[in-house]
């Protein structure tokens, strides 16, 4: 959760550094309150709405508008995480934070959380490019072949992790490996979540 909230804060500051929600988002990202994840998400999506969409945008799997783009992007991310969990012999059915939710692979959802903002950034980039081309918000929100190619390329974006530059996909693998080490060691020390810095986009 620390990494996810921190990454959301970092991205929101890039999107709109003077947005009135930024100060509260920074504060919530480091608090110990139990509602931190939900509150950070609310603030994060308010920044997105005011920057890239419109003020009545609501993030939700079953909502309309740009939500379909985010749903598809997260499906790509989930597939990547599952691939590495299976390769490492980790059962995705046993999670940490998501075990009580309706997910079939809660561990995958746990480990993908810090990476969501990377895909959020590339979805926002897609929306920006579409609107610059004169497309309507409705057209920009369509899942086209070009969008699929654009969002899949997120996995090849160059990122920093463990003081090394690597494709985002390699960072996902490294995080899964570090989680496996933590499980085998019986302690959280070996686990290294991904922290978002500069991303050099592929595609």
Per-range role (PLM):
Residues 1-203:
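Active-site helix-to-loop segments that bind/position phosphate- or nucleotide-bearing substrates
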């Amino acid at each position: 959760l620390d990494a996810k909230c921190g990454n959301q804060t970092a991205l929101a500051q890039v999107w709109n550094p003077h947005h009135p929600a930024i100060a509260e988002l920074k504060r919530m990202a480091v608090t110990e309150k139990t509602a931190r994840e939900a509150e950070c998400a609310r603030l994060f999506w308010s920044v997105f709405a005011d920057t890239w969409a419109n003020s009545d945008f609501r993030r939700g799997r079953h909502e309309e508008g740009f939500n379909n783009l985010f749903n598809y992007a997260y499906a790509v991310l989930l597939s990547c995480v599952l691939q590495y969990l299976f390769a490492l012999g980790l059962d995705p059915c046993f999670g940490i934070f998501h075990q009580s939710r309706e997910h079939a692979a809660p561990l995958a959802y746990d480990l993908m959380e810090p990476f969501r903002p990377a895909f959020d950034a590339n979805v926002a980039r897609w929306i920006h490019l579409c609107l610059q081309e004169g497309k309507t918000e409705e057209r920009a929100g369509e899942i086209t072949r070009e969008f699929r190619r654009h969002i899949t390329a997120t996995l090849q974006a160059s990122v920093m992790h463990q003081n090394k530059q690597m494709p985002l996909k390699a960072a996902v693998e490294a995080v899964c490996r570090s989680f496996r080490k933590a499980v085998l060691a019986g302690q959280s020390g070996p686990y290294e979540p991904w922290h978002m810095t500069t991303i050099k986009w592929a595609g």
